[in-house]
From Swiss-Prot:
PROSITE patterns: WW_DOMAIN_1, WW_DOMAIN_2. Acts as a linker between gene transcription and histone H2B monoubiquitination at 'Lys-120' (H2BK120ub1). Positive regulator of amino acid starvation-induced autophagy. Positively regulates MTOR activity. May negatively regulate the ubiquitin proteasome pathway. GO terms for molecular function: chromatin binding; RNA polymerase II complex binding. Residues 22-32, 188-200, 223-234, 321-378 have a biased composition (Polar residues). Residues 432-443 have a biased composition (Gly residues). InterPro entries: WAC (IPR038867), WW_dom (IPR001202), WW_dom_sf (IPR036020). GO terms for biological process: chromatin remodeling; DNA damage response; mitotic G1 DNA damage checkpoint signaling; positive regulation of DNA-templated transcription; positive regulation of TORC1 signaling; regulation of autophagy. Residues 72-82 have a biased composition (Basic residues). This is WW domain-containing adapter protein with coiled-coil. Residues 99-116, 204-217, 402-431 have a biased composition (Low complexity). GO terms for cellular component: nucleus. It comes from Danio rerio. Residues 529-555 form a coiled coil. Keywords: Chromatin regulator, Coiled coil, Nucleus, Transcription, Transcription regulation. The gene is waca.
Length: 558
């Protein structure tokens, strides 16, 4: 259906328009403007309606952007559109937006809301209008065709814009008006320089090739030489300085760091009151409080704990876990799609699932073996690794402040966090194993080749974490009989039975439906037959009356 736009009459300026048959107001074709329109533009600039939705000529984007040399600019835009038409589809939307901005950059009356209010591009001929009945319609200025539906080109352009804004929002995850690096460096006291080595152990010293998606996944990695703007910073393969601010913006990373620091402090024994740290951790809900707590812990100085001893202890503990678990031939691995864990005999270095999820609330020194058993061993859901890295290469890589020790610390010996953050440690171990397909939003990846995981972190599904009150009443021995293969078997049986019941029920229902339809049709047939009989009876009665009349007439005549 072709519908031409009707021109609404302008109010009281007495100027008639020569192009009444083409009333579209778009950015494409400039119309000659009356000088009074500049004053109307000043009055209408307070109107919150976007200019593309209005049908008054004084509100059209052309007149909003028309200066004294309006005719010259109209002439400049026409050959520009002609060039674009000759170019055809070879002009990319980026080039179009660049040309459009370069055409309008010299304008002194530019509207700041124009880029967000007017979704036009110079390459598109469709424009949006409101008809007299109030419905939106779309008008093509080249073919002079109007239609109600959105045209294909319009939908494609909207899709492109959505994708562009989505990628821009993900890459530029921090607001541009704040400089987090400068704020964090101002908020950090002078004693922070003494603990720079401790932070360096918790920051990745090198990034794997697959970690270039870290900037896309919300973790901007700033160079030390980058300017203090919020724009995206290219990810360098090796970081030149330990930069804490980006680390302090990610809530999941903050929680993992806090848990790692907590277990580190507990391993180093009784220099800090662990009950207070636990209280603070459960109370720290917001990201700002987490940042302040982490600043306090980090700037407490190396007197509170010694990072090098922690690294050696972490390596020894992972070695112990690997040796202890290699005695049993099975391991707990997990299906990436299901939340349950099952026993798999495929992997030689198993994962020990432990008995208690209660967070440590005491500072009494316990042996490292019982500490391993007292906390949950958590790791992200990874496919079975193609090659396990031996411990000697692990130690060789660890002397460069590699973050895998931090990952092992936070994944092996971390107590369960508070109720507001369920299973955050599942994202702490690095996610670049085969088939991983990029990284999660809080993943610090170490210098590991893809497909290999550190020893001691065999892929096991992260169990859901409990609040301390729930963890006190949790006993894993009571659910062991439905864990692993039995649970898998029972779930498969249950799903099969559910599907069978569903199909049988649907079959029965369809049979009943067809039977009911058949009976209903029979009832309808009976009704039709009854009406036919009634019609026959009425017809016969009428004939009987006529015959009686004829009989009476005959008797009179005789």
């Amino acid at each position: 259906m072709v519908m031409y736009a009707r021109k609404q009459p302008r109010l009281g300026d007495g100027c008639t328009d020569r192009r009444d048959s083409q009333p579209y107001q778009t950015l494409k074709y400039s119309s000659k403007s009356h000088p009074d329109h500049r004053h109307e533009k000043m009055r209408d600039s307070n109107d919150a309606t976007p200019p593309c939705k209005m049908l008054r000529r004084s509100d059209s984007p052309d007149n909003k952007h028309m200066d004294n040399t309006g005719h010259g600019r109209a002439k400049a835009i026409h050959p520009h559109r002609g060039r674009e038409r000759e170019g055809g589809t070879s002009i990319s939307p980026q080039e179009n937006s660049h040309n459009h901005s370069s055409l309008h950059s010299s304008n002194s009356h530019s509207n700041p809301n124009k880029s967000s209010d007017t979704p036009f591009e110079p390459a598109d001929d469709w424009s949006e209008h409101i008809s007299s009945s109030g419905k939106k319609y779309y008008y093509n200025c080249r073919t002079e065709v109007s239609q109600w539906e959105k045209p294909k080109e319009w939908l494609e352009r909207e899709q492109r814009q959505k994708e562009a804004t989505k990628t821009a929002a993900v890459v530029n995850s921090f607001p541009k008006d704040r400089d987090y690096r400068r704020e964090a460096m101002q908020a950090t006291p002078a004693s922070y320089s003494s603990t720079k080595s401790s932070i360096a152990t918790e920051k990745p010293s090198s990034l794997t090739p697959s970690s270039s998606s870290a900037a896309v996944s919300g973790l901007d990695v700033p160079n030390s030489a980058s300017s203090a703007s919020g724009s995206t910073v290219p990810v360098s393969p090796v970081m030149q300085s330990p930069a804490p601010p980006t680390l302090l913006q990610d809530p999941s990373l903050l929680r993992q760091l806090l848990l790692a620091l907590q277990t580190a402090l507990q391993l180093n024994n009784a220099s800090v009151d662990m009950a207070k740290i636990n209280e603070v951790l459960t109370a720290a809900v917001t990201q700002a409080s987490l940042q302040s707590i982490l600043h306090k812990i980090l700037t407490a100085g190396p007197s509170a704990f010694n990072i090098t001893t922690l690294l050696s202890q972490a390596t020894q503990l992972s070695n112990q876990v690997a040796q202890q678990s290699s005695q049993s031939p099975m391991s707990l691995t997990s299906d990436a799609s299901s939340p349950r864990s099952y026993v798999s005999p495929r992997i030689s270095t198993p994962q020990t699932n432990t008995a208690s999820l209660k967070p440590p609330l005491s500072t009494t020194p316990v042996s490292s073996q019982t500490k391993i058993n007292a906390m949950t061993v958590k790791s992200s859901s990874l496919p079975p690794p193609s090659s396990q890295q031996p411990l000697s290469t692990e130690k060789h890589h660890d002397n460069g402040n590699s973050p895998r020790t931090l990952q092992r610390q936070s994944s092996q010996r971390s107590p369960s966090p508070g109720p507001n953050h369920m299973g955050s440690n599942s994202s702490s171990s690095s996610n670049n194993g085969g088939g991983g397909g990029g990284q999660g939003p809080g993943v610090v990846s170490g210098a590991m080749p893809p497909g290999s995981v550190p020893p001691g972190t065999a892929p096991g599904r992260a169990t859901c974490s409990f609040t301390p009150t729930l963890a006190a009443h949790f006993n894993e021995n009571l659910i062991k009989h439905v864990q692993g293969w039995p649970a898998e078997h029972v779930e498969k049986q249950a799903s099969r039975l559910r599907e069978e019941a569903h199909t049988m029920g649907s079959i029965y229902m369809s049979e009943n439906c067809t039977e009911l339809k058949n009976l209903r049709s029979l009832v309808r047939v009976c009704e039709i037959q009854a009406t036919l009989r009634e019609q026959r009876i009425l017809f016969l009665r009428q004939q009987i009356k006529e015959l009686e009349k004829l009989k009476n007439q005959n008797s009179f005549m005789v």
